[in-house]
Structures are given as structure tokens and as C-alpha cells.
Amino acid sequence: MADLLNYRKEDSDMNYNINEQKLGFDRVLPWEGQVPALVKEGEHYFLQVKAPEAEKVTFTMNEEEFPCTREDDGIWRMEYTLRTGIQYVQLKIDDVEVVTPLLPITYGYSRPYNYVALEMKNEEFYQVKDVPHGSVRREYFFSKVTEEWESCIVYTPYCYEEETEREFPVLYLQHGHGENEIGWTASGKVNFILDNLIAEKKAVPMVIVMSNG
């Protein structure tokens, strides 16, 4: 319990803002008996999970499975060597897929899926910066086409509520196969990307509509 109480955000040297998920804006802290899923030691990152009863633990990335090494304390770990900022990862314990709340969660491969988000100096375009931020909301509507209740996620720029007479362009974003509408704002960071582009005057303020199709 002492290790859990002493675990602080600043100890990880990683940006919490880009790890936002539906379970909360801040990262989910490890409960008693568990360890953080992603840690940084010096210049190296490690994926890990405590599973003392397991016989095999792997992480899958880019459809390639990487084995973990078991340590004496029952922690399985592997060095995370990929240097892409955002990467889908899948934890398997004894060949059973596990979605861990200790990593951010998105939707990919037609199911809930974990991902890793690192703060990369050459990929700052999706970072949370000190610029005016838009809003992300979920809208609900009844569709006469499907004759069912439907939902979509809508991004509005920072000036949307104030400039009520202004007509904003609308971008409709459609996800790829096996994904759904949450991917654009979860692992995709589209709201932060557009916030930054608007602040840099590289994009005009616009509305983005993201639906599950």
C-alpha cells in the first residue's frame, strides 16, 4: 500500500493529458497489488503487469506478439521500444485478451482496445497546449433512416458559443474498419490537433461530426 500511496503523476515523466480515456481525464492509478502498466526508467519505457499466477504474458503491437519476462515478484515486463507517439497495444495473459484500465482505452479491431501515448518532441501537433480549446460533446438523435436512436460526437471550436451568427464549416469524419466514433477523440486526439491548428492559423475554426458507421 505504501508504494501505491507514494505513486505520483510527476514520477512517471509522461504527459497525462494525452492519456485521457473514458474512465477519467487523469490516468487510472494502480490498485493495491498491481503496478503501473507503463513506466519510464531513464530513457527506456517498459510495459508491465503483475500476474504471479500466469504462465505466459505478451503484448501485441502492429499485429506482432512480444513476450514478457517474468520477474521474481510476479511482475511480467517487456521494454517498449516503439517511438511512435500513439500505438495500439493488446495485453494477453495465458493467451486471453485483457483490456487493462491502467492504459488508456480506445476502440479498435472491433472491440475495446488499449493504446500507449507518449509525449514525442517531433509529434507535438496532438499535444494539449496552452491555446484556446474547443468543446467535445455527445449528441443524441432519432434517425428516420435506421428508425433507432443514434449518437454522434461533435467538436465545436472555442469561438462557437460566442459567434452565434457565424456559419462554421462542418467536417464529417468517418472511422475506418473495426473502429467507432470514440477513436477520433480518444486515441486520435482530433480535438487537440484542431485546437492547435486553429491557434497557429493553419486551419479555420470548424465543427467536426463523428458518428459510428
Roles of regions detected by a PLM:
Residues 3-29, 33-66, 70-213:
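Non-catalytic cap/lid and distal C-terminal segments of serine-dependent acyl enzymes
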